[in-house]
């Protein structure tokens, strides 16, 4: 009975650890979904994709790319952007909901969006002045951190 308990604990530990192991591997730009390549061509004109990788973790699949200007972008398996980090310039305003962009333009006229993360529930933004803003799915501001 003691051996069975130990075996059960070992099996349980192995299955608990499985989601933490991710398969990350570089891929060719042509292996990216067309939606990702089109997004980059539309909103990051003048840059090229310097590096691309796919990450498989349990049921999560995402694409990560680095552009020639140092920008880092992440996309889900459907090719929708989930995170954008810019080094020297603003996240393109055309991809930010107009209600959020207007709030930032009015409230922080000298700042721009350096980073944005988005999922079905939230938009999290980091501005060039160091403020971190969180908006809910209704585009209502719900948190500010400095």
Provide a role label for each language-model segment:
Residues 1-26:
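Bacterial Sec-dependent N-terminal signal peptides
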